């Protein structure tokens, strides 16, 4: 796994984990702001890493373990904050529960949690998700424009999405969707000594209902935060300055 680091001269470490369907460089708009005060660590999740096109996505569990092991090996067994969005939020959830490393703060932004459903049904849902993204790989740039809100996303944003989709193979598509919705968690989940926030956009409230309920159950002290006017995975992409301000305020809270 490729790990990208910025602001290494800073004492406090912030780990950023990206959503499904994008690459590590999706954080390019917030890195220049945050690296002034924080050591930024961004894992390029296998299957979505342009520098390692031969690597496939494995599982939320394995990726969480590899990230934790890398942090430990590099003297970062305690970090300031873990931030993960969507798929990245699933990885953060698993890292927190396993407790190989410790974090002072964590933000699970629209994070995906394991289905609490009959097992055969989870396979059917996985097949549906796989088909949708596999078909998306073959959609034209013109057709893709109709999917994105032109008032929110630029032509460069749409070309970026098309480039990422074109680079995904079938194995990564299946594994990433299925694992994000069905990853395992320790039983029982240990007490986590970390300030955890679950963020979601007001426009995705219905879609995140089960995730919020699950996170509230496993992390009873979680702070649930609704970001007004936002949809899934929009905050840091469309409003980088406001996102960084809110994240820094969260990391500045005292016990």
Model-flagged regions — what are they?
Residues 41-81:
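Active-site loop/oxyanion-hole signature of alpha/beta-hydrolase fold enzymes
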Residues 84-92:
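Gly/Ala-rich beta-loop-alpha elbow adjacent to hydrolase catalytic centers
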Residues 97, 103-133:
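Flexible "cap/lid" loop of the alpha/beta hydrolase fold
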Residues 117-118, 137-190:
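Conserved alpha/beta-hydrolase catalytic His-Asp/Glu region
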Residues 192, 198-200:
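Short beta-strand/loop motif that positions the catalytic acidic residue
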Residues 202-207, 233:
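Acidic catalytic loop of the alpha/beta-hydrolase fold
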Residues 230-241:
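Catalytic histidine-centered segment of alpha/beta-hydrolase-like enzymes
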């Amino acid at each position: 796994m490729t790990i990208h680091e910025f602001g290494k001269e800073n004492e406090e470490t912030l780990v950023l984990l990206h959503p499904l369907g994008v690459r590590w460089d999706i954080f390019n708009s917030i890195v220049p702001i945050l690296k002034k005060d924080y050591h930024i660590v961004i894992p390029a999740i296998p299957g979505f890493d342009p520098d390692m096109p031969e690597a496939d996505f494995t599982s939320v569990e394995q990726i969480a373990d590899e990230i934790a092991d890398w942090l430990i090996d590099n003297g970062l067994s305690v970090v300031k904050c873990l931030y993960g969005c969507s798929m990245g939020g699933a990885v953060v959830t698993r890292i927190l529960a396993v407790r190989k490393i410790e974090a002072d703060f964590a933000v699970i932004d629209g994070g995906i949690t394991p289905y609490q459903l009959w097992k055969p049904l989870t396979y059917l849902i996985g097949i549906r998700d796989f088909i949708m993204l596999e078909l998306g790989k073959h959609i034209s740039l013109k057709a893709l424009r109709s999917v994105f809100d032109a008032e929110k996303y630029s032509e460069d944003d749409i070309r970026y999405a098309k480039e990422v989709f074109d680079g995904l193979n079938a194995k990564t598509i299946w594994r990433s969707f299925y694992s994000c919705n069905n990853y395992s968690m320790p039983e029982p989940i240990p007490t986590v000594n970390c300030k955890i926030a679950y963020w979601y956009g007001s426009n995705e409230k219905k879609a995140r209902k089960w995730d919020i309920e699950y996170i509230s159950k496993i992390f009873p002290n979680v702070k649930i935060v609704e970001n007004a006017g936002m949809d899934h995975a929009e905050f840091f992409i469309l409003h980088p300055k406001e996102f960084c301000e809110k994240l820094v305020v969260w990391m500045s809270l005292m016990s």
